[in-house]
Amino acid sequence: MSVSVFNRCWSKVILETLVRQGVSHVCIAPGSRSTPLTLEAVRLQNAGSVTCHTHFDERGLGFFALGIAKATQSPVAIIVTSGTATANLYPAIIEARQTGVNLFVLTADRPPELWECGANQAILQQNMFGQYPVANVNLPKPNADYSAQWLISLLEQAAFQQKQQGGVVHINVPFAEPLYDATDEEVNSHSWLQPLQRWLIQKKSWINVEVQQNEVLMHENWDHWRTKRGVVVVGQLPAEQAMGINSWASAMGWVLLTDIQSGVVPTTPYEDIWLANQTVREKLLQADIVIQFGARFISKRINQFLQAFKGEFWLVEQSGKALDPYHHSLTRFNAKVHHWLRAHPPLRQKPWLLEPLALSKFCATFIEQQVGGNLTEASLALRLPTLLPYNGVLFLGNSLLVRLVDALTQLPESYPVYTNRGASGIDGLLATAAGIGIGSNKPVVAVIGDTSTLYDLNSFALFKNVTQPTLIFVINNNGGAIFDMLPVDEQVKDQFYRLPHNGDFSQIAAMFDLKYAHPYTWADLNSVVKQAYSRRKATLIEIKTNPSDGSSLYKRLIEQISHAVIGA
């Protein structure tokens, strides 16, 4: 039996199985040991079953796949060769695990006889990602003693675990040489595949899983709790689940606190600012019940409120993950938000607390005055909605800007917002944004800090394949301005936290053949944005600001609102 032919047969079954689990995008890094998998992915692309994407940097490739999976809400497969190529996927795997994004990670490996004996590019790859995958599938070297049916069943069991929990399936695939000599005809006619001929034609899963839909029932004490003083807190949610929360909370007369990732239009915007007001926060803590939809809040003030609240606490979240870092004694509903709302009709009543609305209105005027008309981090955050396309998506990086956007921006209802807030790292943000653009096939506005951009420069190469207008805002405040919030000596802060780079991104844009603009005023920016939307390609828009402007304004707003006396 030809080793190269059987390597391809083995790979054919793996890839065909993943396609039947919903994979339509395969992200591939170049490498020799992964050749059997790569060639089968190419065959599937030629057959119209998948789209293949390539990138030379495995770390960026992992986040690119993450972005596609976020946008399509379908699993994405990644193929890499053996050695440290596999380790570079770890950050994206961590983020996927934290946020329940489905990835199939296929790591080609040296065969077992080459492990731990000094062979080139052979590292210990089995279970190398620890507890982060929902399933680790450590395959043997391709061997006809294992039936094709066994291989499919093993992979589908892992895929079932993924559907239940959300996250990463790691499939480690050792291959012996030779890797290159097989033809498609030799593979397709191999006797090992004969029992699968009907399966290969029908395109159905090997194991049919009947999913039981659990109906959401009204809580037995809902008629009691809906008469009480309540606060609704909304974190990161899929866009389709945001509808109806605002009107439901308004009908109840309850206070609504929303995260920018929620897609919910706030009734009392600027929560991150006005929650700094001690008088209002103390009154809010007198609520009888808090109902939290979603999780992973950006706002420090919302998190502080959740931590301080000691009353009845309900959490509505469909993933089943533990998403209460403050360890409330709570009632949990594993349900989609709109299903839960339908099962818990509101009781129409007047607002029980008027101060948040009054303070929110005061903030609107006060913030406008403080931000002013110059092109700065804060003004970009405040007026970001004027720059967004009607049918587009927004990606926010992990920097000072995401906090300013969360504090100051009011987006249209259910406007798609993507973030990497699972581990909240600054790695892979450009790559994730590129993947979201490819996966959504919509115009993208990405807003990313300068340090984050420097950390992921290689991923600018991924934007050459976008087919929709893509605006990459790089906020250049000369380093990590987010660290201005720390109570650290200024000299120490510069040397060990902010790390000023004193550069710009014009030559970087040229290197990656990106359109580049550096507007100085809002008039300049509006002109640049108009031109960028006329092109079905990426434009890098660099906004240079003074290092401390954004952080100083943010601290000033919080400080002044904290002492404001507002009549309800």
From Swiss-Prot:
Gene3D superfamilies to which the protein is assigned, alphabetical = 3.40.50.970, TPP-binding domain (3.40.50.1220)
EC number(s): the record gives: 2.2.1.9
Cofactor: record remark: Binds 1 thiamine pyrophosphate per subunit.
Provide the reaction this enzyme catalyses: isochorismate + 2-oxoglutarate + H(+) = 5-enolpyruvoyl-6-hydroxy-2-succinyl-cyclohex-3-ene-1-carboxylate + CO2
Q: Coiled-coil ranges per the record?
A: none
Which InterPro entries did the record assign? MenaQ_synth_MenD (IPR004433), MenD_middle (IPR032264), THDP-binding (IPR029061), Thiamin_PyroP_enz_TPP-bd_dom (IPR012001), TPP_enzyme_TPP-bd (IPR011766)
Q: Which cysteines are joined by disulfide bonds?
A: none
Record's keyword terms, sorted? Magnesium, Manganese, Menaquinone biosynthesis, Metal-binding, Thiamine pyrophosphate, Transferase
Q: In which pathway does it act?
A: Quinol/quinone metabolism; 1,4-dihydroxy-2-naphthoate biosynthesis; 1,4-dihydroxy-2-naphthoate from chorismate: step 2/7; Quinol/quinone metabolism; menaquinone biosynthesis
> Under which main EC class is this enzyme filed?
transferase
Give the PANTHER family listed for this entry: 2-SUCCINYL-5-ENOLPYRUVYL-6-HYDROXY-3-CYCLOHEXENE-1-CARBOXYLATE SYNTHASE (PTHR42916), PROTEIN PHYLLO, CHLOROPLASTIC (PTHR42916:SF1)
Chain's role:
Catalyzes the thiamine diphosphate-dependent decarboxylation of 2-oxoglutarate and the subsequent addition of the resulting succinic semialdehyde-thiamine pyrophosphate anion to isochorismate to yield 2-succinyl-5-enolpyruvyl-6-hydroxy-3-cyclohexene-1-carboxylate (SEPHCHC).
Record-given protein name = 2-succinyl-5-enolpyruvyl-6-hydroxy-3-cyclohexene-1-carboxylate synthase
Q: Which organism is it from?
A: Haemophilus influenzae (strain PittGG)
